[in-house]
């Protein structure tokens, strides 16, 4: 387990040079200041790294989706404009067809074309 609160571990992590960073459902649990710090760290230290994140979004949600958002423990579920401002270094797209029920997620990505990959995958499984 790598505790990034320890400065020695940050140096170790920087030497590791990951080629893929995946943040699954965590951004909506973190305030804007923390996300901006993480984004700066990724941009400055891992600019060539593949990046992918997925989080719920407030965006014309269905009734069930709205209820799930209200019950979510994440205090920072944002709308598309808030995410656009906060995640401006990354590409993004919103989907509502990943799960069997209608539930909107926003994907942020960098250094690969996730949207094209996703659309091709959806065609293949249809």
Regions found by a protein language model. Give the residues of each.
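Short catalytic micro-motifs in class I SAM-dependent methyltransferases
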Residues: 25-29
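Glycine-rich phosphate-binding loop signature in dinucleotide/nucleotide-binding domains
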Residues: 13-17
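Class I (Rossmann-like) S-adenosyl-L-methionine-dependent methyltransferase catalytic domain
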Residues: 1-12, 30, 34, 51-126
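A short glycine-rich, Lys/Arg-flanked "PGG" loop and its adjoining helix->strand segment in the class I
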Residues: 36-49
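A conserved beta-strand element that flanks and buttresses the S-adenosyl-L-methionine
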Residues: 22
């Amino acid at each position: 387990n790598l505790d990034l609160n320890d400065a020695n571990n940050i140096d170790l992590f920087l030497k590791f040079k990951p080629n893929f960073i995946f943040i699954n459902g965590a951004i909506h649990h973190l305030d804007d200041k923390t996300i901006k710090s993480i984004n700066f760290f990724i941009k400055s230290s891992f600019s060539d790294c593949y990046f992918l994140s997925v989080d719920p979004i407030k965006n014309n949600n269905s009734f069930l989706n709205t209820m799930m958002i209200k019950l979510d423990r994440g205090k920072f579920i944002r709308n598309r404009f808030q995410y656009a401002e906060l995640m401006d270094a990354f590409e993004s797209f919103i989907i509502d067809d990943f799960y069997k029920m209608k539930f909107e997620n926003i994907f942020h990505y960098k250094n690969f074309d996730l949207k094209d990959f996703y659309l091709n995958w959806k065609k293949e499984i249809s």
